[in-house]
Amino acid sequence: YVCENTPEPLLNLPGAFSTRLRAPRTGSMEMATYYMTSFLCEYSRALLERAIEGGYNFADCLITPDGCTMMNRAVENMELLNALGKEKEKFFFEYMEIPMKADDNGGSHEHYGIDISDKAIRQAVAEHNRVCELIRAIGEFRKGDKPRITGYEFHVITLATYAAPKYLIIDKLEETLEELKTREPDEKPYRARVLVVGSEVDDCGFIKLIEDTGAYVCADRFCYGSFPGRDPIELNRQRPARVCASGRR
């Protein structure tokens, strides 16, 4: 998937897992610029460039919400150019019209037989919320006068939760949280505590660059960060799929 507004639990049902598409260390974007023009943002063009290069051939489907126009153009070009799923008969693209149409997205069930029952969705939400709980707990260690974790380290850990299967990293996050409780704070003095706000900030090197200047990234609010992407999802008596879809910003 390509946007923070995609409801992750609906993509992380038993037998499936999601990964947020990135294009790290992108060089030339000539092919993507040819199809999308230079007026569109570098992030959307980098994704299309990587797709044309075959960097996302591991995927079995691509699901995207009706987010920004530039991201929609990137996905539309991927589909028109047949850049993904060339040798996968069941591959499909899906555009989610959320939150205006927050009903079930049954594409994964129709093509791959994925369980989309309420029970399966509630299980995926519980797993998602556990990841959110751990990330928020780890992030609390950034508040101290002498932080026990750097902003760069926190960004690397948070970024992993958008790319890896949740069930494979929960125990690693739990180990990290326990380690931080006894970790000796860095004696390095920071001249300023910085909040980084933006959209697709997925380059950990950018956070490291800020901290190498003497600042400390103590909080974040961007699409690959802990706010708002690692907000827990509170279920109620409604259909869980509807809650997941309508609850994303």
Predicted regions and their residues:
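Short, charged, surface-exposed secondary-structure boundary motifs
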Residues: G27-M36, D103-G106, S226-I233
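Redox- and metal-dependent alpha/beta enzyme cores, enriched for Fe-S-associated oxidoreductases
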Residues: E4-N5, L10-R22, G198-R249
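Acidic/His-rich segments in extracytoplasmic proteins that coordinate ligands and/or metal ions
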Residues: R45-E110
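Glycine-rich, highly charged phosphate/nucleotide-binding loops
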Residues: Y35-E53, R249
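Metallocofactor- and cofactor-centric catalytic cores in central/energy metabolism, strongly enriched
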Residues: Y1-E4, E8-P9, S28-A32, L40-A46
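Hydrophobic/aromatic beta-strand patches that form the interior of the parallel beta-sheet core
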Residues: T19, I63, E94-M96, L195, ...
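A charged, amphipathic alpha-helical module
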Residues: Y1, S108-R230
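Extended, charge-rich low-complexity interaction segments
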Residues: A51-N57, C61-I63, G67, D115-E127, ...
